[in-house]
Each structure stands twice: as C-alpha cells, then as structure tokens.
From Swiss-Prot:
It is a single-pass type I membrane protein. This is PTTG1IP family member 2. It comes from Mus musculus (Mouse). Keywords: Glycoprotein, Membrane, Signal, Transmembrane, Transmembrane helix. It is found in: Membrane. Residues 1-19 form the signal peptide. One of its GO terms (cellular component) is membrane. Residues 20-98 are extracellular. Residues 120-150 are cytoplasmic. It comes from the Eukaryota.
C-alpha cells in the first residue's frame, strides 16, 4: 500500500492549497458577496413565481429550478431538502422517477463503487502478502487438487 501513501503525500498539499486559495478569495471579496446575496434573493422570488405558473409535470420538470409535487399537482421552486411535499412524491428533471428513486439509485451506485474499491484493495493486499510469504520460505501450493501418488 505504499502507492496509496505516496499519492496521499502528493494530493494532500494540493487539496490544502486549493482550500486556502478559496478561503482567501472568499474573505477578500466582501462587496461582491453581498451584491450576489441580494441578487440571489431577487432571483429566488422570480423563480417561485415562474414555477407556480407551470401547470403540468413535463412543463415543470423542464426547468431544473422547479419540482413537481404529485400529491398537490403543483409546480414549486426546488429547494432541497426543504419542501412541502413528501419525499417520494417529488419529481425533478423527469416525470417517471421520483426524487426518492433518484437518491436510491445514487446510493446504490456509491455502494457498488465502494464494494469494487474494497475488492481491489483486498486483491492488491493479497498479492503483496503472497510475495512476502514466498520470500520467507513458505511456498504457495499450486497443485492443490492434483491426483496422483507421492
């Protein structure tokens, strides 16, 4: 697992420097930040009105800023996780799979990737330890099920 340690020595300073640069930019640009804050508030009110005018699911979900609530049959502004609808009746970006289904699909993909990573890590771990056992005098058994007399 030396390659993992080597990559961590390379990537950790890179990530820390990116985080530090981002922090410096955020602290130094206070005027623009307050300007964007008010601009976002005005835009949010506009989006709420715009979403409320849409009356069907396909029209509502075309706009990525809106969600369709199946129970109330109304289009609302997308504000995850704060919504008046139940989680399994929210449709975002499509009218076929609700938001609960999308989140479950994402979790399944993450679990599958984690399992694949675990299998690869175990494979490399076993390869490394087989080489160590062979160097210390233990020879792996190749013909375990071979028939014949000794």
């Amino acid at each position: 697992m030396c390659w993992l340690r080597a990559w961590s020595h390379i990537l950790l300073p890179v990530f820390l420097s990116v985080a530090l640069i981002q922090l410096i930019f955020n602290l130094s640009d206070h005027k623009t930040k307050t300007h964007h804050h008010w601009k976002r508030k005005i835009e949010a009110k506009y989006v709420e009105k715009e979403c409320a005018q849409k009356e069907t699911c396909p029209v509502c979900t075309r706009d990525k800023r809106c969600i369709w609530c199946r129970e109330e049959k109304v289009c609302k502004k997308y504000c995850f996780p704060y919504s008046d609808c139940k989680f399994n009746s929210i449709f975002w970006a499509n009218c076929n799979v609700d938001l609960f289904g999308i989140v479950m699909l994402i979790l399944i993909v993450i679990l599958a990737l984690a399992f694949l990573w675990y299998c690869l890590a175990y494979y490399f771990y076993m390869q490394q330890h087989m080489a160590l056992y062979a160097r210390h005098g233990q020879v792996p058994v190749y013909n375990w099920d071979a028939p014949g007399d000794w």
